[in-house]
Structures are given as structure tokens and as C-alpha cells.
Design a protein with these regions (language model features):
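Sec-dependent N-terminal signal peptides of Gram-negative exported proteins
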Residues: 15-25
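N-terminal secretory signal peptides
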Residues: 1-11, 18
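Structured, non-membrane catalytic/scaffold regions adjacent to prosthetic-group chemistry
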Residues: 33-404
Length: 404
């Protein structure tokens, strides 16, 4: 397999070299065209992207203006990190404006020493940075009923990957001295609906983070400024934004967003609740729905894979609708609970092809097909969909959802 990867790259490079050689004839004209005719834009206090870059989030508004979601343009992304400005958003009751100088995090309930901490108090504590994915529990939710998503953004865009900086929650819980019998932490946000989620104490003491930074700067208001709870590998809704209260209890709160919402109604009429962990998932981002290949030739298929259970171990790609699979190359480093980019050199011969990816994580869990997922869970749920996504590359190079 390694030899075939090297051969594919050499073929691509040879084609590129030939194109460059032909382009040398117009070198002087190109140099003249690329010379700026003015001094350009002045220095500014905050960096802006080039006006030639057009990638934006796709926004889906709910019934009220305070609620809604916006989807990351995954097909336009490079590497594995999502710019903060393109990170997906999901709001249930607006985005509050919070003065960090007035904000407090209260840790109370079944503890010996309740604490009220300012943002500056938290920033003075030993901090860590962690690269991790956040994925909304409802990401790809429409795929349960029908795989009608026309492109990656609208089918898979409620997921993003950032570097987060903050303080270990375990450190704070050791300071308050959790009392005997406490087994849950009720996290509450400072938004208008005071959104709450119940978190098992074991998770809080494991890898939970009280974050104040994202991608090298302070959290943005839409991402929970000034403080956010981060729970690696768990559905986005549990990562409570605008965090202001952590209450230790001996039972879950049974809040709306962990009973009526973010639960999975099964075929037998029973519901799975507290289904926190997001399972292994992947999607090809190029070529994908809405894109066009200019003609037959060699291309690099690429996409993203992630798992709430740790590292991605393997990604396989099919170009014949699942009849055969080839192992893709994984970009290093492969981090737990983070995006892993995969690549495979592929020759498009001008005939119709149906492509998809399938991820396997370090636990051995294999991403299922939609049919395999529905056979177990039915179609009553709108959450936790991680089935494979198939794209159809037509003979003319256009790419569409293979199942529409």
C-alpha cells in the first residue's frame, strides 16, 4: 500500500511538472499581472482574510430569532483545525453579552468548601491546551429520515475542531472537596434559558476542562465567552456555554435537554438517555456534493474522520458503492477526539463512480452504513447519526448525493 501511495504522488507531481513547463511560455506576462499596482490595504488592529476567500457558515434559523444553528463549511477547510469564525454554532436561547469582570463560576452543592471564582481567578490556575472536536448531537440528524443533504456542509456541518485552553475541572473539584454520596455535576449556563446538563462525576474528574480560550484567543461570545465546560468526546450540548454554576448532587437533574431532547427514541418505544459519547464518523469532503471535477485524471480524495472514543485507527474508501475498499493515508499527528484528515490518490476515468469513507477508531468500532444503523435504532431519532455518506461522481464530473 505504501508503494501505491508513493506512485500516486509521483504521478500527480509529474502531471504538475508538465503543466508548469507549459506555463513557462507565459512567465513574463504572469509576473507583470501579479505585480500590485498600488500599496494595498493598510495595517489593521485585527487580521482579516483575503476578499477572494468566500467560505462562510450556512445558517438555519429556528422559529424564533434567538435560536438556530450555523454549519461549518467542511468542504472548504484545509488541515484539521476550524477557524473560530467558521466554528459551528447552536443556540437555544440567544447569545448573552457577559462582562468577564462581573462573571463568576460558583461550585456548590454537596461539597465541603463552596467556591465563587472570577474569570481572572481561573486564569491564574495551571492551564492546559487540548485539540478536540465539538459535534452537535443533532449533526446529520436529517439523514435518519432520508439522505437528502446536497453537500457536506448541510449534511455534516455541525462539527468543528479547535484548540481549547483552560483549567482542569478535576483541579477545582479537589479544591472544593466533593462530599460523600455526590455522583453528578449539574452544569448551568448564563444564557436566557439557563440551560443545564447533568454530568457524571467520573467524567468531571477525568478529562473535563473549564475553557476560556479557543485557537489562541479568548472564547468568542457564540462559543460561551467567558467560560465554557468542555467534555472531550461527548455531544456538543453537554459542553455548556457561558458556564456560571456547577452543583454537586447525588442524582441527575433530568433537564429538558437530556430527556425530551438529545435522547434517542428506539423502535420498541423506549428511549436511550444520557447517550453522551459521539461515535466514530467520517466524510469525504473532496470530491463531494456540489463540486465538479474538470475532467478525467488523477485526483486526491480527501476528508475528515473523528471519534469520541479516541484516535482514528483506519479510514477506508470505496469508489464502487461499497463493493471494495482501499485503506487511505492518515495525516499525522492523529489525536484523540480530534479531526484526522485522510487522503487517497484516485484516477477518475470519466465513468460514473460512487464514493464513500468508513472510519475505524482505536477501540475497534467501525462506522456503520445508514442501513446498519437503522436496523438497530430505527428512524424515530434525530440525534447521534454516524452513518456513511455516499457521493456520486457523474460522467461529466459533477458530484451529487448518491442517494437522492
Amino acid at each position: 500500500m505504501k508503494n501505491s501511495k508513493r506512485t500516486g504522488r509521483r504521478q500527480l507531481l509529474r502531471l504538475g511538472a508538465a503543466a508548469i513547463g507549459g506555463g513557462l511560455l507565459g512567465q513574463h506576462k504572469a509576473e507583470a499581472a501579479e505585480t500590485a499596482g498600488n500599496l494595498g490595504i493598510p495595517l489593521g488592529p485585527y487580521g482579516e482574510r483575503s476578499p477572494y476567500e468566500k467560505a462562510v457558515r450556512w445558517t438555519r434559523q429556528s422559529k424564533t430569532p434567538e435560536t438556530g444553528s450555523s454549519f461549518t463549511p467542511l468542504a472548504d477547510s484545509v488541515g484539521t483545525l476550524t477557524p473560530s469564525s467558521l466554528h459551528y454554532e447552536r443556540h437555544h436561547s440567544g447569545i448573552p453579552t457577559i462582562d468577564p469582570a462581573q462573571h463568576r463560576l460558583i461550585i456548590h452543592g454537596m461539597v465541603d468548601r463552596p467556591l465563587s471564582l472570577s474569570v481572572e481567578d481561573i486564569k491564574r490556575l495551571p492551564s492546559i491546551s487540548r485539540t478536540m472536536v465539538l459535534e452537535c448531537g443533532g449533526n446529520s440528524g436529517s439523514e435518519w429520515a432520508a439522505t437528502t443533504g446536497p453537500d457536506v456542509q448541510r449534511s455534516f456541518g455541525l462539527v468543528s475542531c479547535s484548540e481549547w485552553t483552560g483549567v482542569s475541572l478535576a483541579l477545582l473539584l479537589k479544591e472544593v472537596r466533593v462530599g460523600p454520596g455526590a455522583s453528578w455535576v449539574i452544569a448551568e449556563g448564563a444564557d436566557a434559558c439557563r440551560m443545564m446538563r447533568s454530568v457524571p462525576l467520573a467524567k468531571a474528574m477525568d478529562d473535563a476542562l473549564i475553557a476560556y480560550g479557543q485557537n489562541g484567543e479568548a472564547l468568542r461570545p457564540a462559543q460561551g465567552y467567558p467560560l465554557r465546560l468542555l467534555l472531550p468526546g461527548w455531544e456538543g450540548n453537554t459542553n455548556v456555554k457561558w458556564l456560571h454554576s456547577l452543583r454537586l448532587t447525588d442524582q441527575p437533574y433530568m433537564a429538558r435537554d437530556e430527556t425530551a431532547k438529545y435522547s434517542d427514541l428506539m423502535p420498541d418505544g423506549k428511549a436511550r438517555i444520557f447517550t453522551y459519547r459521539m461515535e466514530a464518523k467520517s466524510v469525504i469532503t473532496f470530491p463531494s456534493g456540489g463540486q465538479t471535477l474538470p475532467g478525467p485524471g488523477l485526483y486526491e480524495l480527501t476528508g475528515l474522520a473523528w471519534s469520541g472514543s479516541g484516535k482514528i485507527e483506519r479510514v477506508e474508501i470505496t469508489t464502487d458503492a461499497g463493493k471494495s475498499w482501499v485503506t487511505a493515508q492518515l495525516q499525522e499527528p492523529r489525536l484523540p477526539n480530534a479531526f484526522t484528515r485522510f487522503r487517497l490518490t484516485w484516477r477518475f476515468d470519466g465513468r460514473e463512480a460512487v464514493i464513500a469513507s468508513r472510519a475505524t477508531d482505536e477501540t475497534g468500532y467501525v462506522q456503520p452504513s445508514r442501513e446498519e444503523l437503522i436496523a438497530v435504532r430505527g428512524t424515530n431519532s434525530g440525534y447521534h447519526f454516524n452513518g456513511m455518506k455516499f457521493w456520486k461522481v457523474h460522467a461529466d464530473g459533477t458530484v451529487t448525493n448518491a442517494e437522492v
